[in-house]
Amino acid sequence: MYSTRGELDGKSLYRIHQKGTEGEYRESYYYVLEAKLVLHPKIIVSFQTEFVENEDRKEMEKQDCERKACWRLMEKIAEAFPRLPICLCGDSLYACEGFFERCREMGWRYILRYKEGSIPYIAGEYRALKGKEGNYQERVLEDGKEWYDYVEDIDYNGYHVNLVEYGSYRKRVYKKGKRKGETEEERKGFWFATDFPVGRKNVANLVQRGRMRWKIENEGFNTQKKQGYHLEHQYSKDYQAMKNHYYLTQIGHMVAQVMEAWEKLWSQNRQSREQRHQRVLESFKKVRLKENREEIGRRIQIRLELE
């Protein structure tokens, strides 16, 4: 969320950059950990939030702070949705014994982006065994190829982890712009840690599900930051008001995604995006809420005082 080199309130986190140099400076910022639900390729909605607050006023240690926030968030989700089958997609930060333990206790599954530095032992076992397992498979594409490999049942302190490797090689041809007609080689490679059983028939599907994390990042947070929602703007100096605005942003983005997913229906009306959103806004004004009817119906007066 919002960050600045200036001062924020006591709830904010901070980091010292370029320590011990002339360019040393302090960055203060607000941080939130968000659980998003993938309902549809075009609909990714927020369904639980955990604001990370600096209770002891120490410099933030990303790994420690974010993991602790994740444990609190998982407890919230389990309490609110005790019977909901859940598969968590996340980055390599969560590849640790504490995460595996909580998933086992809650009966949840996981597909995590994995990097060698997360748990080096798992990477070492994978490299030692993958050539012996014979699970490598390759598929030829029109513009290149992609391949999969995996090793099942790597024992890490009693937790059985399956590691999946995905790689691709493609030739990209520029069709527009200054580089039109030029060819560029593109190589990608990712590892995923999961507790789902892995086989030749489902390995591609598991990789696709694991890559949902990027969809959440790109179509969720990046959309809110860069496409009109201005999530990183400080809308208020009051911490609670800022949190309220964040929640409203999540609701607004959810409504917008549902609208855009109904593209075929809206195309018949031939209206711009702004016009469609305005129509939805007007429809909200006509809805009578069942909750707190007495408070809504009570006459009030708002007086503004100029200083």
What are these regions (language model features)?
Residues 23-27, 180-184, 234-246:
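Structural motif
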Residues 30-32, 42-44, 83-85, 107:
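A general structural motif
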Residues 137-154, 225-239, 244, 249-307:
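A short, flexible helix-boundary coil/loop motif
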Residues 1-41, 48-50:
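Active-site-proximal, Lys/Arg-enriched surface segment
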Residues 200-235:
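Short amphipathic alpha-helical "interface-anchor" segments enriched in bulky aromatics
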Residues 187-188, 193-199, 223:
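Active-site rim beta-loop-alpha module in soluble metabolic enzymes
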Residues 1-5, 35, 70, 88-95, ...:
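Short, conserved catalytic/metal-binding motifs centered on acidic residues
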Residues 56-172:
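An internal, acidic/charged active-site-proximal segment
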